[in-house]
Amino acid sequence: LFVVCDNGPYESQGDGGIAGLIASLLYQPPAMRYRTLTVLTNTPPRGPQSQPGGTQSHMLMEPVISKAARKLGIDHVAIHRINAPVGKALMNGPNARGVRPHVTSAFVKEALDKGAAMFRWDERKGASRQKNGNKVRGVGVALGAYSGGTIGFDGLFIIKPDGRMYVQSGIGNLGTESVTDVHRVAAEMMGMPWEKVVITFGNTRNNLPWSCISGGSQTIHSMTRAAHAAASDAITKAKQIAAKVLGGQPDDYTVADQRVSGRGRSLSLAEVASKAIELGGAFDGHELPKEINPFTVKSATALAGQGLMAVAKDTYPRDGQTHSYVAAFAEVEIDREIGSYRLLDYVAVADVGTVIHPRALGGQVLGRSILGMGHALGQKWVYDQQYGVALAKRFYQNRPPSILDIPAKMEWTAVGI
């Protein structure tokens, strides 16, 4: 695979390297030679819009896979299943010790099977390429993958004597709802109703913890882990306080329904918060874990003394690199006389692990799919060959997809493993 990247006038964007990584992951070649060259050009600056490198990889490889299936007489779904990553699949080249990296999991075959059933692939492929006057319809399948999360960030929240849970979050709000969704994990673990959760986010002046960037397809994975770590810290402290007040050992108690209960007695979380202020130390944030980021230390120090403080770093193990996957099916109608084409049907099945917010995930899956349709159908990069000035800079020259361009029927689901 040899990829040449038109990079624009500034530093390398890195798309070429990622394209090779994604190709090695999605199609699992036993041996692969990969080269990439980034060229500086006198053209307008550009940056990643979505999935840099992954999109190029799919565009290069999927027509090759489709052509191979036709030449070999193999079903298009079957050829993808044969080459799909499974389990802790290997990817990319080896490191200095000769060890290749691997992913945490891959259930791409399951995504293909689920998508084929939803799309009625076996039924519809028989009618593919049959002519109806000057029109012909065809069906196709393709795979996509991209990095799905990072690790090692901090979670921070306080339960105050008013019984509410005040979450501090460094995540920005991109409109995908992950800004709040990740903290439902902590609320659920504490038995706290969502209407009693107050979230402060996106302004570093408000004493926020060290968080992942709001991009790179990582927020849900990265920050649910951090939220889980913080909630685990709060549960440990709440049980210790209950043992001090009510007697017994911390392991005698459980946290649920806004209470710490055990030995036939209980405390509300509001009472636990008041006691945390009285006890001080680690309970209210005057003593902090050594492993948290210095940025989090400053924020937690500023918030100390207000209630039961939960602060922790995600130190959970991870075996491999986290990636997400999608299997996509589409039906297209082409007018052979005038060359026009229409997308008639589209189904996407995502392998993303545990789904936190189904509706938001559906928006992501179908929204990114429409973005890809735009790249394929109407959005082109055109510039003046002499001066490097952008020419396709208006909607009628570089047209994003409208409701008239996308299929009337679009469905999605998740593997759910």
State each model region's role.
Residues 48-50, 76-82:
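Short, cationic motifs built from Arg/Lys/His that form the positively charged side of catalytic pockets
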Residues 70, 83, 340:
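ATP-dependent carboxylate activation and anion-phosphoryl transfer catalytic cores
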Residues 71-73, 78, 191:
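Noncatalytic alpha-helical scaffold of FAD-dependent oxidoreductases
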Residues 1-57, 132-417:
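Gly/Pro-rich active-site capping loops and adjacent beta-alpha segments
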Residues 81-158, 397-400:
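Accessory "access/gating" subregions that flank catalytic or transport cores
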